[in-house]
Design a protein with these regions (language model features):
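Intrinsically disordered, low-complexity N-terminal segments enriched in charged residues and glycine
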Residues: 1-96
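Conserved P-loop/Walker A NTP-binding site and adjacent catalytic elements of P-loop NTPases
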Residues: 93, 98-173
Length: 173
């Protein structure tokens, strides 16, 4: 993103705001707050070109990290399970709605396939896909199963957190 010194036009500010909405989830709040602070300073006549340039660099960095996460999504293979027959429909619903409730028989693949369906529609690129389990052993078992299906090692794209035990990395989805 190119921000020219001394020219913080409404169009450039609008571009910054738009780009912030595309950043990593964990960065959005802080970037928006920093932009608001800079705009407030600008209204008070305390223009600081260097701070606008630094903000633009932070936004670019966050966008690059998000692109790297997108590029690191492993190849997704869906085994022959009942939920796999409806994966396109479920993916479309996940893309269109903030909340989707999926009901199915035990063993239909909900637990292991829904996170992969979420990955297939780009979820997990701006932040983590959370998957809760009622017991510690279940959390480890589910994570191991998904890792096995993706052909990776624990902690790469898939990890788990149980109390103080963290098996995730920066690039975990």
């Amino acid at each position: 993103m190119v921000i020219t010194k001394g020219a913080h036009s409404q169009a450039q500010i609008k571009k910054l705001k738009k780009k912030i909405t595309l950043c990593l989830s964990r960065d959005r709040f802080f970037l928006k707050r920093e932009l608001d602070r800079l705009l407030n300073e600008q209204r008070q006549g305390k223009m600081n070109d260097e701070k606008f340039l630094q903000l633009a660099d932070k936004i670019t960095y966050s966008l690059q990290k998000k692109e790297n996460r997108q590029a690191s999504i492993p190849t997704l293979v869906f085994p022959d399970l009942p939920i796999s027959e409806r994966k396109d429909e479920i993916a479309q619903l996940i893309s269109a709605h903030q909340v989707v409730i999926v009901c199915g028989e035990t063993g239909s693949g909900k637990t292991t396939q829904l996170p992969k369906i979420c990955l297939s529609v780009g979820r997990g690129c701006a932040g983590f896909i959370g998957h809760t389990q009622p017991r510690r052993i279940a959390a480890r078992t589910v994570a191991n199963r998904i890792v096995e299906e993706l052909g990776e090692t624990m902690g790469q794209s898939v990890g788990y957190k149980i109390r103080f035990h963290d098996k995730t990395q920066e690039r975990s989805l």
